[in-house]
């Protein structure tokens, strides 16, 4: 829609000049101002086909002006620019009815493209205005990578689209899921999280979908599942790559038909739940290995969102440190200041545990060190002390990997820790043996390209015994091509 009039408001003269020149070259009529009062006068008079405005101006904040604009001219697209590149800025822009949000500095080509799309669209449905009552900062970071995540989340807030979050362990996948829920249309419903890796495989279906009385040994009463608990809200499926095949089939039915049955039940139950899934695995590789359903993958991967590792957004570390120090202060710990050399050293660290590792370090420093200022020397000592010192970790460091018994011991330690002061459900011995059998049989079948005779010989099992275990454990049998 060349020839359209663009109203530009920014108190920075250089930005006004750049936008005036770029938009004029693109064929638009441009009117520029440095204040909100003039912008509002133009809009109230019916001038302009689109607005490009900064958030902070000398006389009024654009977020205060936006509701008046949307009330007076609900079809007028408003693009918001801001140097305050935070998650809440993106959310406020969306909630107040902005067409889009651009963090400064931005790409002019991208801006012109957004303007073209906005002007080409039919009249837009007015956005629901929300009370700006939450000033918390659920996500922290001003890097380019985080800006893109903020923009995607802002666009998803008022939808029920299924989201697949990928990223390394500790990157904040559950935080993103919670932010999407807390600031989205389902905020008044429950947020329910379940970690597939922390639940025994034979209990996952019951945990997800619930079970009826007498559905299996030990089911003495009816139990609600996570889907029922999350009704009207959001269900976060963490470590989705660890979900067994039977549970995957049930989940696919929910996504396809919007209903499920409890374990042992016959009556379908309608489901009104937004699903957000997360994994640190390569699910496409799992599909090729026969461990994950391809049709389920595409049902879950409607909107993919990859969270970057902390080493790829090291510029966010000072903001994250300040955030964690503030959290520690709220918990009654002393306020600490990190000197610049300490921060630079932290920015250079690879952080294999990502944001979770950084948070643990900051909490440890605020709790254990009497110094008001955290120096480079303190950080060096702490990072050096992270060299493994337990017998298991020392063995792993020497060999480069954990032995099977060490891996089991470490896994069981984490498993018991996940229950806090409580104990896991009874029957742990049989569950652990089953957990060991599954990967062992799968590895043997993979090594023998699905040949059960060779796999049985490799395992030292009778062929019929192997077949029985394959059925009981739900091991996926597949054959790989011999040719490269």
Swiss-Prot record:
This is DNA-binding transcriptional regulator NtrC. Keywords: Activator, ATP-binding, Cytoplasm, DNA-binding, Nitrogen fixation, Nucleotide-binding, Phosphoprotein, Repressor, Transcription, Transcription regulation, Two-component regulatory system. Changing residue 464 to Y: In ntrC283; appears to be constitutively active. GO terms for biological process: nitrogen fixation; regulation of DNA-templated transcription; regulation of nitrogen utilization. ATP binds at residues 167-174, 230-239. Residues 452-471 bind DNA. Pfam families: HTH_8, Response_reg, Sigma54_activat. It comes from Rhizobium meliloti (strain 1021) (Ensifer meliloti). Its main location: cytoplasm. It is found in: Cytoplasm. GO terms for cellular component: cytoplasm. Residues 5-119 form the Response regulatory domain. The keyword Cell membrane does not apply. Member of the two-component regulatory system NtrB/NtrC, which controls expression of the nitrogen-regulated (ntr) genes in response to nitrogen limitation. Phosphorylated NtrC binds directly to DNA and stimulates the formation of open promoter-sigma54-RNA polymerase complexes. Phosphorylated and dephosphorylated by NtrB. InterPro entries: AAA+_ATPase, CheY-like_superfamily, Homeodomain-like_sf, HTH_Fis, P-loop_NTPase, Sig_transdc_resp-reg_receiver, Sigma_54_int, Sigma_54_int_dom_ATP-bd_1. GO terms for molecular function: ATP binding; ATP hydrolysis activity; phosphorelay response regulator activity; sequence-specific DNA binding. The keyword Transcription regulation applies. The modification 4-aspartylphosphate is found at residue 54. Residues 139-367 form the Sigma-54 factor interaction domain.
């Amino acid at each position: 829609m060349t020839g359209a009039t663009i109203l530009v408001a920014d108190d920075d003269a250089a930005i006004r000049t750049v936008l005036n020149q770029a938009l004029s070259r693109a064929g638009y009529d441009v009117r520029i101002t440095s204040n909100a009062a003039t912008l509002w006068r133009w809009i109230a008079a019916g001038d302009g086909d689109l607005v490009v405005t900064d958030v902070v101006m000398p006389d009024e904040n654009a977020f205060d002006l936006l509701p008046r604009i949307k009330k007076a001219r609900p079809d007028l697209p408003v693009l918001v620019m801001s140097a305050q590149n935070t998650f809440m800025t993106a959310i406020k822009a969306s909630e107040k009815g902005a067409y889009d949000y651009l963090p400064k500095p931005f790409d002019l080509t991208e801006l012109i493209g957004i303007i073209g799309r906005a002007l080409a669209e039919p009249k837009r449905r007015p956005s629901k205005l929300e009370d700006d009552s939450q000033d918390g900062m659920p996500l922290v970071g001003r890097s380019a990578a985080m800006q893109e995540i903020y923009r995607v989340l802002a666009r998803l807030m008022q939808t029920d689209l299924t989201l697949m979050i990928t990223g390394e362990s500790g990157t904040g996948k559950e935080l993103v899921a919670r932010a999407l829920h807390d600031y989205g249309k389902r905020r008044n419903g429950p947020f329910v999280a379940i970690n597939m890796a922390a639940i025994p495989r034979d209990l996952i279906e019951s945990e997800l979908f619930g079970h009826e009385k007498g559905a299996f040994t030990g089911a003495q009463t009816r139990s609600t599942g996570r889907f029922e608990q999350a009704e009207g809200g959001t269900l976060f499926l963490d470590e989705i790559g660890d979900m067994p095949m039977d549970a995957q089939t049930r989940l696919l039915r929910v996504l396809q038909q919007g209903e499920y049955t409890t374990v042992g039940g016959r009556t379908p139950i309608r489901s009104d739940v937004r699903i957000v899934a997360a994994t640190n695995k390569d699910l496409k590789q799992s599909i090729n290995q026969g461990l994950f359903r391809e049709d389920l993958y595409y049902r879950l991967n409607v909107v993919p969102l990859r969270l970057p590792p902390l080493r790829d957004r090291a510029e966010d570390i000072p903001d994250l440190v300040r955030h964690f120090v503030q959290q520690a202060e709220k918990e009654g710990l002393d306020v600490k200041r990190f000197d610049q050399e300490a921060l630079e050293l932290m920015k250079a660290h690879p952080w294999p545990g990502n944001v979770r590792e950084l948070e643990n370090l900051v909490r440890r420093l605020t709790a254990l060190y009497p110094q008001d200022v955290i120096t480079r020397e303190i950080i060096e000592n702490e990072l050096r002390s992270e060299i493994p010192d337990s017998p298991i970790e020392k063995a792993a460091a020497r060999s480069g990997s954990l032995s099977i018994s060490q891996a089991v011991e470490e896994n069981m330690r984490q498993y018991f820790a996940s229950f806090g002061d409580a104990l896991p459900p009874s029957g742990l011995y049989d569950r652990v043996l089953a957990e060991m059998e599954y990967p062992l049989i799968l590895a043997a079948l993979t090594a023998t390209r699905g040949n059960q005779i060779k796999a049985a010989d490799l395992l030292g099992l009778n062929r019929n015994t192997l077949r029985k275990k394959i059925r009981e454990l739900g091991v996926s049998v597949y054959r790989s091509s011999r040719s490269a």
